[in-house]
Amino acid sequence: MGSFKGHALPGSFFFAMGFWWTMKNILKSVYKRQTRTCYLNSKTLLRRTEIWEGVVVLLMSLTGIAGEQFISGGPALILHKDGQWNQILGWHHTTMYLFFGLQGITQIICFTTNVLPLSSSKLMLSIAIFVETFMFYNHTHGREMIDIFVHQLLVFVGTFSGLVAFLEFLVKNNALLELLRCSLLMFQGTWFWQMAFVLYPPCGSATWNLSDIQNKMFLSMCFCWHYASILILIGVKYALANWLVKSRLRKGCTSEVGLLKHADREQESEEEV
């Protein structure tokens, strides 16, 4: 992960999954508020969606593991070499991907068999996030100030995300907790991208002074801006989903009224005959 791509890849994974889960939870919530029957709550559709989510998470994790181990001179699954640990930071990242892969497998098992309770996938998600946080907490020894600081902020978001995911495991079907967890996952995703630009600026970009206190102050403010942007994005998505559902229900009601009028006319014509 010691490169721009190495930070952009997990950032894209976190943001994509958080974005999808946000849309799914918003649509479920809006449908529940607008109508008693919700197609999104169909057991068959729900199971299929959860299974495919597990498959996608597993594929993302395998992609991350392959990238860490075999691309750009990775350790290639060799942990100890020439009397010392072989690229131990790469193994940290592999461990993080491993636990998210286990979460994907758990979700697939939960929704394809009756071996595990459905809430096990939420518990495994919480564990995976805590493992990610633990890895990054022990990731920055001996580095420069800004490098340590941006990782500390990631650990802060990860710890909060893990706690919310665990609360979601304890408190079933809480829409606010679900949205909070999704927003924090998206937050981790955007912050991974910010770390990529700070620590490994692309060619042609200005290099950050990693020992400048003013850069630290700016990144503190930038950190808050990231989450503000995510909250605004969620608000826009909620308003859009609410408008789409209302317009769809309005069309449904109009078509039902049209069918009733057509039936009344047919009945009147039959009576005249």
Curated annotation (Swiss-Prot):
Pfam families, alphabetized: DUF716
Regions that span the bilayer: 8-27, 55-79, 108-131, 153-171, 217-236
Disulfide-linked positions: none
Topology class, membrane: Multi-pass membrane protein
Cellular compartments per GO CC: plasma membrane
Record key words, sorted: Membrane, Transmembrane, Transmembrane helix
Main location: membrane
Subcellular location: Membrane
Family from the record: Belongs to the TMEM45 family.
Full protein name: Transmembrane protein 45A
Organism: Mus musculus (Mouse)
